[in-house]
Amino acid sequence: PVLKALLARPASSAPQDVADHYVRLYTVIGSPDFVVHEAELRARILAGVTRSYRPVGTMRQMLAIMADTTRARELRRIQCPTLVVHGKADPLVPLACGQDTARRIPGARFEAIAGMGHDLPPGVVQAILRVLLPHLREASA
């Protein structure tokens, strides 16, 4: 279902059709434990589409992701306090990929958020802040 949702396209470029498409996508990749009601999700997506919808930019980003090979060498060069946060319920990027990223960054900490998918719904913000704020305090000490 994830690949099908990623490869799907809106019925047209009309804002409502684009919003429908992204509601379907976020329903597949979203956080199962931080559910956003469809009306709220649709309103947020429609506001974003109305503000700035650039399908060519989205396609460029997808092509860049697919063309990329590895950043392993670059990750080893990071020299600042690093926290890698990953959703345990992310259907798009496996948890092991987030763990691998953290392992490759010297001194990095890894935190997996239960019930978080490949999105940032309002409900997950508190869970992220619980791990992010202590990290920021330690980094600035």
Regions found by a protein language model. Name each.
Residues 107-141:
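Catalytic active-site module of serine/aspartate enzymes centered on a nucleophile-bearing elbow/loop
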Residues 1-73, 80:
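Alpha/beta-hydrolase
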Residues 78, 84-86, 90:
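Short beta-strand/loop motif that positions the catalytic acidic residue
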Residues 76-77, 103-104, 134:
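Solvent-exposed polar/charged
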Residues 25, 93, 120:
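Hydrophobic/aromatic residue at the end of a short beta strand that borders the catalytic acidic motif
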Residues 79-80, 107:
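Active-site acidic short loop of glycosyltransferases
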Residues 91-97:
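Conserved alpha/beta-hydrolase "acid-adjacent" motif
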